[in-house]
Amino acid sequence: LLSKIIKTAYAPDFTMEDINGELFTFSELKGKLILLDVWASWCKPCREANPEMVELYNKFHNKGLEMISISLDGTPEQTSPKEDWKKAVSNDKLTWTQLSDLKGWDSKIRDSYNIRSIPYTILIDQNGLIIGQDLSHEALNKKISEILNL
């Protein structure tokens, strides 16, 4: 039953700073297919998955996919979370919208989207409905292709 509820849930709106300090509001992308990728610079599996995210972006962005990465950098163990985040974005060549409130696991996005582990992906359709969560690279590829009629 829970999976059915989640599949028909609307994606909560949020506003967060991007990597350049500009405010970004999620609802500005209404009407687009969106892939949210939640990660952090200190998360080894996240960093290992970043090349797959780059591949998805390169394959689907010009065909209608918007990608947003949200970093959970800002844990108490980090002495310079913003620098860690910026360096990882640069090193991993993440060229799409990058957001973080630099609050680590206390980030408001965590509760809004019920995120318990990272990396974590959330696929949101053009109507703002969450249609997939924590999907594998293969599953994302397939689902995005289907939605964009490719």
Show where each model-derived region lies:
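Short active-site neighborhood of thiol/selenol oxidoreductases, capturing the structured segment around
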Residues: 25-47, 53
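Active-site acidic short loop of glycosyltransferases
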Residues: 30-32, 62, 94, 115
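Short, internal strand/loop/helix patches
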Residues: 17, 83-122, 126
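N-terminal targeting or signal-anchor segments and their processing/structural boundaries
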Residues: 20-22, 34-37, 74, 106
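Structural microenvironment flanking redox-active thiols in thiol-disulfide oxidoreductases
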Residues: 48-92, 103-110
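Thiol-/selenol-based redox modules, centered on thioredoxin-like
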Residues: 118, 123-150
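N-proximal helix/coil linker or "cap" segments that precede and/or mark the start of modular domains
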Residues: 1-22, 27-32, 58, 83-90
